[in-house]
Amino acid sequence: MPEVERKSKITASRKLMLKSLMLAKAKECWEQEHEEREAEKVRYLSERIPTLQTRGLSLSALQDLCRELHAKVEVVDEERYDIEAKCLHNTREIKDLKLKVLDLRGKFKRPPLRRVRVSADAMLRALLGSKHKVSMDLRANLKSVKKEDTEKERPVEVGDWRKNVEAMSGMEGRKKMFDAAKSPTSQ
């Protein structure tokens, strides 16, 4: 059954109008939020920083006021430094935790693995631990074959190699090779 393209229920002009209305509303909200932040900033500064009355103060009173203000500035500067250090520490910790989460999820790129030849004994040691002394001799189960018997069964033909080359050349030689390959399997 061929799939029928679904027509949008909203026309393109209507979509565009809705999009522009949404952007206008978002802009209004952003401007309002910005104004609220500025008002909050002014209110906070007016609470924390009292207006200075420097008129009518003597030189010694002005110097005392300056020393007092410098001390307050130093305290605020130390607090700012401490907050920056805490923020930096928290940022590093967040970064480390994000890496741990990625490791746990398995979302990191795995390096290409190389094949490593491991003997059966080494594999068992790795699986069971170093406490267990397990020896797995796989060759013990194999049937032993004596080399001398196999060599005696086949008689070694020693002949002139030139005659063999001449005999095997041409179509007759190929036929002999074909027949020779056929004969051992039929026995």
From Swiss-Prot:
Protein name: Troponin I, slow skeletal muscle
InterPro entries: Troponin, Troponin_I, Troponin_sf
Primary gene name: Tnni1
Matches recorded under Gene3D superfamilies: 1.20.5.350, 6.10.250.180
Gene Ontology, cellular component aspect: troponin complex
Subunit structure: Binds to actin and tropomyosin.
Region (Involved in binding TNC): 2-48
Gene Ontology terms for molecular function: actin binding
